[in-house]
């Protein structure tokens, strides 16, 4: 891992650690002044300054954006759903990349050799692989969480507590560590013979073929395959539910549950489907505002983990047949009541002859409750579609950023020659992903955008006062 500078075999690179200039490149190797003079740098002064400025900007944006994400999740009521802890952990990994990895990669790149000693070389390389692996395993866990919330509906949402989410996050980090730390245990020492030792130290991760292939599979390709399969399944479920005929989409029709069968409410009122004990089971359901079993606070809109962009009228844009114009005041009250429906509760059914067993006919106030609940369900269904889209964007951007590196790195293990400049570009392009998630949240997520504005403008308001 840490060795003195030697000519590299063709295709030998350092994964997610230091990318060294070509040992045979006359711009720096062999150009050291006789008698131990000053080392020549691999780049001109202008190129070096450009690289330092770009990498510095990348680090600042990564730290700033991801700190905002963490503050927003802990301070915004709309973002306190337990599953948003995944985003906090993911943002923490990106911050650690920007503070503990990128600065040393930059120094190693512009100096042309490893300056920081053997011990930190080993730590640096392990942390680099750890943080990158944890990012993609986090995305894999988020995808599985999303899939379970769709296929298991009420059962999984009741189990989705902060304690359970934290346990999953710990598991994610443990899996990432298991994948990342073997190079510290199995290190191939090279260049340690009795021959003369070149002056330039080199920090390079284990380049044995078995490790390159296994680390690429464990750190990237296997989690990617899981995410793709999960997302294909989510897409199939969503597509099947959108095929429900329009006549079946009213408040008295039930969208097909994940099992593929359809059920009609048994005197439950306008909710879309019936779960155990008469609880509402919505398509693509998600946890709202806090721990399962807690009533959602009454407010202008419902929120979801990573809730998506929506207009102020998203809950009103599509209304099912039935009472269409509940008054603003009663509607707000009815919405709060509807959000507190628990297993075992039931709502009266609208219309003549539609009362459930032992349930009196619905009055005007109860009809407003049913209409508000059905309208809220339609708005939530639309937000679910946008949620699926934004999660696909986050995962897609990660894959686009890191796939070129892992693909070319795998090619080097099987003996293919990859241009060193191209490999360096893919390496740094992967680091750019750490700064992009906050941008994605800002573009597609109303709650994050509102929380960011509140955080950033708070100081301005204080100065004005």
Swiss-Prot record:
Keywords: Cell membrane, Disulfide bond, G-protein coupled receptor, Glycoprotein, Lipoprotein, Membrane, Methylation, Palmitate, Phosphoprotein, Receptor, Transducer, Transmembrane, Transmembrane helix. Pfam families: 7tm_1. Residues 313-330 have a biased composition (Basic and acidic residues). Residues 1-48, 112-121, 188-209, 411-424 are extracellular. Glycans are attached at residues 25, 29. The record marks 128 as: Implicated in ligand binding. It is linked to Lipodystrophy, familial partial, 8: An autosomal dominant form of partial lipodystrophy, a disorder characterized by abnormal subcutaneous fat distribution. FPLD8 patients show selective loss of subcutaneous adipose tissue from the limbs, beginning around 13 to 15 years of age, and abnormal accumulation of subcutaneous adipose tissue in the dorsal neck and face, as well as in the posterior thoracic and abdominal regions. The disorder is associated with metabolic abnormalities, including diabetes mellitus and hyperlipidemia. Belongs to the G-protein coupled receptor 1 family. Adrenergic receptor subfamily. ADRA2A sub-subfamily. This is Alpha-2A adrenergic receptor. It comes from Homo sapiens.
